[in-house]
């Protein structure tokens, strides 16, 4: 991955800054309509869109949840730790994880150097 793109991905987003400032939980309204247990594609994909790409939010644990879309995570730098149906899986730079719809999982807190890219697809 080109350093320029990696530098862009390492910028701390507005959402991530809130976590660094002490907001303990993920911003539910960004991901779910009701409870964080199901992440809703309608909040992440624009109407008519079949796929989107976004960086994984760092500095916060993502609690156990499922999606109504397919998620592909690419680890661009560092590592990401997922707990998938009770089993821990550590992904490292260059690894790709594909999760089908409704797979129950959680993601441990990623630090500054841990860069994951989420591909969200119907």
Indicate residue ranges for each PLM-predicted region.
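Generic protein-terminus/edge-of-domain signal
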Residues: 1-76
